[in-house]
Amino acid sequence: MSTTIRASQLASSISPKTEEKQPSVFDIIAQENLATSIRPALQHLVKYLAFFKPKTFLSVHRNFDEYYIIFDLILQNHYLRNYGASFTENFYSMKRIASGTGNPPNDGRERIMSLITLVGWPYVENKLNQLYDRLKEVYECRSWSSINGMKAKCQKMFVIIWPYIKTALKAVKSALQLAYILNRSSIHSPWLYFSGVILKHLTPEDLEAFNAVPLHLQTGYQISRGTLNEHIHLRFFNRIWRFILGLPGIVSRLFAYGLFFVQFLDYMYNTDLAKLTKTGLDGAIPSPPHKMIISESEILSLDTNKCPICLKKRVNDTALFVSGYVFCYTCINQYVNTYNKCPVTGCPANVQHLIRLFV
Amino acid sequence: MACRCLRVDQLDAHVLDSEIRSIAQDSVDDVVNQMPLWVARIFEKLRPELKVTLEAVLWTHRFSRGASPGQEQMDIAYAGYTPKLITSHFMVEVIVPYLTRRMSELSGRIDISRMYSKIEAIYELGSLLHFLYFLRSGGHSTITESIFSLRNWNNHQPTISSINYDTQNRELMWHAFRDVILLTYPFIEKARQRIVKKQKLDRKFTSSIGSSDIECVVCDKPSVIPMVGQKCGHVACYTCIATSRNMTCPLCSENAEPMEFLAKKLKNPILIE
């Protein structure tokens, strides 16, 4: 998947744009990859800040989903209103146009639907996934037989149905993507269909329109009234206002470059560079030295199928990996929960160190 | 058809075609992974058939557009690519390798498999020589193209069109990021190792630790049969330091501190009656 980014640059840099054709599937996958990079990158940044400044950023870290949806709404609304595309689509030189009219979705129903599919649905899907994981874990601890009441029945129904819904959505997306590759469909995702838009490449006229300065802010604009002093003041304020208007563009451009760097890092770590940094055990492991580990001679004199705790035949063999001895599961579980150490060697241990042996 | 196309365009078209194939295959695998286990097992058994079916679906692009998706991206196409020729090309390119491989697998006889491997190796060698000749002198880029006398032509006359600064900016940034990473990575890695080693030197085993994990200083996981330095107090797995041949502390390698089993340092436990 990471080589798709390189393929998108290969395809878009060489092919001539003599006519307005739909973007290549590589561009689309690359911009989707960039879109999925925003949220983990910001989450990692917030976690890092919360670690160093807990008083300021801990609440942001706890409610990251809500803060992120507000930020995403502002960002995508700005891009849809000014550039007619989402943030990542604009970065990869694409724009959205309404299916019926061919106009950019700056206003009206297409923009609202685009915001719902770009910002609202990922949030809802994330919440549903978290709910599914939580309910699945709850019903695995308890059994399904304790279901009573309407709410519990609804929860059980949700746990059963949600995986099928996800599979169906993924299948529809794959089918549309294949149809898009074969030029039999003008949309590559069901969310574009719901938004009522299709994707197109940016044209030079669009790029010139983005850089247009409002008429009354242009430097050479002639003022028919007022004195020279008033003229100088007006020009100064025009420059300040033009700078303020240009500031969101500058900030979003720098933000885009930062995310492109994140995408590049992801590409590097998924390819050959990661192999250089991996270290592993090499060489044969020699046999352990024959040293006396414990001084209790009665432990060593036991039969090999005896438990060192209850001194009976072992039931449900369980190894404690901090020492390697094998016990009954009930004996060692009780002992480790009580004393937090190995009964034979005394090494610190907890229930995470128990290894069930199914032989 | 304007003129014959460059070799680099043909190579790029092949790269794009293989990338599209992998994208389609990943999409199908992604859907199959979401399905129940018995469905996934059936699909795993029928993986070669699924692959051929997907290839056939992608080859329908040539019937409708006269070129493969990668060729269309590069604005090139074969001259005289008739539907009959497309069918023959598909048979030789996709069906024949599938049938020969499947028959050699299903027959179960070792000599047929060995003979098939030899034929495949000879074909690969021929393909490599043909490819080297193509890089040197041009002509057909694959053996099957030579068999069917297929040549790639540009659909339009190549021109110096308007410069796409957005794409060039992304390409320049990509290469700039790569150079920055390759330049600074050794220093970052050295600084990281120094910080990690300093942290590990401070991590010693003390008897006051009650229920916390004893982490190995080599593999950074809970210690399996922990060994502790007799003087320095660093903890490592038995298997991690056994590979160093002389059972010394990996952090205090200049002092050659000997290590012993952690169990020997602890007092005798009390058994439950």
Curated annotation (Swiss-Prot), chain A:
Residues 1-24, 82-106, 185-253 are peroxisomal matrix. It holds the Pfam family Pex2_Pex12. InterPro entries: PEX12, Pex_N, Znf_RING, Znf_RING/FYVE/PHD. The keyword Transmembrane applies. The chain crosses the membrane at residues 25-52, 57-81, 107-128, 134-184, 254-281. GO terms for biological process: nematode larval development; peroxisome organization; protein import into peroxisome matrix; protein monoubiquitination. Disulfide bonds: none annotated. One of its GO terms (cellular component) is peroxisomal membrane. Residues 53-56, 129-133, 282-359 are cytoplasmic. It is found in: Peroxisome membrane. SUPFAM superfamilies: RING/U-box. One of its GO terms (molecular function) is zinc ion binding. The three subunits of the retrotranslocation channel (PEX2/prx-2, PEX10/prx-10 and PEX12/prx-12) coassemble in the membrane into a channel with an open 10 Angstrom pore. The RING-type zinc-fingers that catalyze PEX5/prx-5 receptor ubiquitination are positioned above the pore on the cytosolic side of the complex. Belongs to the pex2/pex10/pex12 family. Component of the PEX2-PEX10-PEX12 retrotranslocation channel. This is Peroxisome assembly protein 12. It comes from Caenorhabditis elegans.
